[in-house]
Amino acid sequence: MLCDPVSYTDRPSILSSTSLQEGTLTLLHVETDMDMPFIFESLKKESAKNWDIQPLLDNFKKSFSYIAGSHTSQAFIVKLNGLPIFEIEAHEGPKHAPLHSGFQAADGDYFIIMIAGHFDQAAFSVYISSLQFCLEYFFRYPEVKRIIAPVYDGSDREQRAQLLIQTGLKGFLEKTTPTEPDLFTIYRP
């Protein structure tokens, strides 16, 4: 199952890899001590706030440790040549908090949430290839029938929407309140 709990021994094993012109792309489960500073810095860029990193980093570690043991959510890190470029989470739709008032998740729906800072770790084309790579991996699991990605307001809103569209997702539900996201979706090929 895509969201089976993860037990770490020393380092997470590579779940999938592929070669790009820019190098080797790998998908792994998040390894808290090694990947958390990158994820936190990406969140910091997305929020455009100057947070005190240490207390929040400790809370994020606990949160990701919880996700690792979850049966309904899982966190992954995508690396190019061993360096992280973004974190992506998969959440079982019916068990995840509703993202939009006009949408009810069904069995087989999975939400993905991507933390990528300002998309400044690689060329934008690498992000497109990387997200396609993740979707291919997620769709290997028979329980995954549809993937839904939210796009919230923010300085990178258009860039995120373009990433999803160029990866093959289609917009299907626009926000109706300021706090709701637009939703994009793709079905199992």
Predicted features, each with a name:
Residues 43-46, 67, 167:
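Alpha-helix boundary/capping residues
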Residues 23, 74, 86:
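Short beta-strand or tight-loop elements
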Residues 55-75:
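Active-site rim helix/loop that mediates acceptor-substrate recognition in acyltransferases
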Residues 33-40, 61, 65:
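An amphipathic alpha-helix signature
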Residues 1-19, 27-31, 35-36, 82-189:
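Acyl-donor (CoA/ACP) binding surface of acyl/acetyltransferases
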